[in-house]
């Protein structure tokens, strides 16, 4: 047998036990990809004021061979501690996180790509003898199917005042705020296999 599959009695290509290919589905679907991460930290101060600032960027190009996927994340942190008076301490913490993910819907949280790949038989052909992709690789869903785009903006803020009116007597006041703005977009395309 010199072809990856043969037609059945209806003229359709065989793709399970009657096919003849030898496919490593993980290698067909995934590739090595680059990721980059950059960090910046600044801190300083004196006995009455201390500050810390950090920023981080992570970018990943994605590891799908078919159907583009990308991920970006930006994180910033800010901390400030001050003791302007003997009877008062001030602490401020702020954090901002931005995440963006763009990938085929078939690979999103409810997608079945990883589930399906681990159940594909090696003899299931990747392409038919005419050079067209077979339906088993889910390539049509990855390349022409639906997309999932999401971005998230998380902001955290914490403030604290510590009063020392008398020796060994502390009064603490805290405030915190967290906001999460999430944008999800999914476009659903019909895919024929």
Language-model-derived ranges and their functions:
Residues 1, 35-37, 50:
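A beta-strand signature from Gram-negative outer-membrane beta-barrel systems
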Residues 1-22, 52, 58, 62-156, ...:
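Surface-exposed loop/interface segments of Gram-negative outer-membrane beta-barrel transport/assembly proteins
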Residues 25-27:
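Surface-exposed cleft-lining segments at the edges of enzyme active sites
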Residues 29-33:
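Short Gly/Pro-enriched turn/cap motifs at secondary-structure boundaries
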Residues 35, 46-47, 83-87, 164-166:
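Outer-membrane beta-barrel channels and translocator barrels
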Residues 39-43, 79, 158-160:
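Outer-membrane beta-barrel architecture
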Residues 44-48, 57:
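A generic beta-sheet turn/junction motif
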Residues 155-161, 165, 169:
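Short, Φ-rich (hydrophobic/aromatic) sequence segments
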């Amino acid at each position: 047998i010199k072809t990856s599959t043969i037609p059945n009695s209806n003229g359709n290509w065989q793709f399970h036990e009657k096919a003849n290919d030898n496919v490593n589905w993980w290698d067909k679907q995934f590739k090595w990809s680059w990721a980059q991460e950059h960090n910046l930290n600044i801190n300083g101060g004196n006995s009455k004021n201390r500050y810390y600032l950090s920023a981080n960027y992570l970018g990943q190009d994605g590891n799908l061979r078919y159907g583009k996927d990308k991920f970006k994340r930006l994180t910033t942190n800010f901390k400030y501690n001050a003791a302007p008076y003997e009877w008062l301490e001030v602490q401020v913490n702020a954090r901002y996180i931005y995440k963006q993910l763009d990938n085929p819907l078939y690979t999103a949280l409810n997608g079945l790509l990883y589930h399906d790949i681990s159940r594909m038989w090696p003899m299931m052909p990747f392409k038919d003898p005419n050079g067209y992709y077979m339906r088993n690789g889910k390539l049509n869903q990855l390349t022409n199917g639906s997309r999932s785009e999401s971005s998230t903006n998380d902001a955290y803020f914490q403030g604290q005042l510590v009063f020392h009116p008398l020796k060994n007597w502390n009064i603490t006041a805290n405030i915190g705020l967290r906001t999460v703005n999430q944008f999800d977009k999914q476009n659903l395309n019909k895919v024929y296999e």
